[in-house]
């Protein structure tokens, strides 16, 4: 089983709120990111978007794809491609486990959060299955009912 991760890391840079709405997250993993110099500078400034990102396992390695890291303003000719594929640093057993989980149809790997831990950029990835439209509506109804119950309990 994957390790338990803190709910809100101290140095949270970006969060993919849409992933929780669109996917049932089955398991989470913490992975390091291989970044160039201008990329880490942009990430530290918070210039990263996880919205359309996903991860893929290829030839025993995991890659983060379609995550946009804006070019660094002072990067001149050494700037990076904003949408390049970035390697994820995971243990071999974790990569094998993620690969086995994603063999099933409808299972996807999505980035949930990017944060700094001891000076290194980390990404929390979640393995999840896509929600159908009626599942999303059901989740919203349940959240609304919970809010109403909490409101009623506070008024007592």
Curated annotation (Swiss-Prot):
Annotated Gene Ontology cellular component terms: cytosol
Family: Belongs to the SmpB family.
Entry superkingdom: Bacteria
PANTHER family xref list: SSRA-BINDING PROTEIN, TMRNA-BINDING COMPONENT OF TRANS-TRANSLATION TAGGING COMPLEX
One GO BP: trans-translation
NCBIfam families documented for this protein: PRK05422.1, smpB
Name recorded for this polypeptide: SsrA-binding protein
Region (Disordered): 134-156
InterPro entries named in the record: SmpB (IPR023620), SsrA-bd_prot (IPR000037), SsrA-bd_prot_CS (IPR020081)
Function of the molecule: Required for rescue of stalled ribosomes mediated by trans-translation. Binds to transfer-messenger RNA (tmRNA), required for stable association of tmRNA with ribosomes. tmRNA and SmpB together mimic tRNA shape, replacing the anticodon stem-loop with SmpB. tmRNA is encoded by the ssrA gene; the 2 termini fold to resemble tRNA(Ala) and it encodes a 'tag peptide', a short internal open reading frame. During trans-translation Ala-aminoacylated tmRNA acts like a tRNA, entering the A-site of stalled ribosomes, displacing the stalled mRNA.
Subcellular location: Cytoplasm
GO molecular function, one term: RNA binding
Chain's gene name: smpB
Keyword terms, alphabetized: Cytoplasm, RNA-binding
